[in-house]
Amino acid sequence: MDGTWERLNAALRERLRVRSGRDPQPSAGVVDSQSAKTTGVGGEARGYDGGKKIRGRKRHLLVDTEGLVLEAKVHSAKVPDQDGIGLLLERAREHLPRLSYLWVDAGYRGRGKEWAEKALGLSVEVVHRSPKPTPEKVLFAWAREWHKEGRSVDLDQLFPRRGFEVLPRRWVVERTFAWICHNRRMSKDYERLCATGEAFVYAAMVRLMVRRLARD
């Protein structure tokens, strides 16, 4: 927990970015969090995420547009994303001098977005899901189509059932969480200390990037 894994992650990430023709320092990133259940070993900073109905900790990630981890922060699951972004990005200016643009989800609206813009001078774009149609909207659309066609209308054609939705830019960080969770140690948060959890995030990414570099 002396920062070795974080430094290895940064060195390998920069090498992969240069290999793909990019600047070693990113100018844009994507932020999201994942709530993970903790085990019975005890430890610091545990809490309950009311939205996900999970008791444990959150893994907060900032990734580049390739999904490579720039910053990782582990904290109590009860900390809302609007506050967690401050914990995640507190060293962003020191480590990522070119960073200027962020994509986030709707959980960061309000004070989280405002803090990143004012304190760090970042441009922050909130990526929204497609709006769910209200009953009134469904009824109006059905009546309009019925009047136009003079026959019954299939509502599933007007409003397809919503399943998994790939969100622009946001899918990149979701894929990173999937990469990390391929490691059995990351299926839950087994650690007593948040710093140990952060080290395992970086270690998982180091493993992935070493394999990529070894293939070439």
Model regions and ranges:
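Short alpha-helical elements
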Residues: 1-216
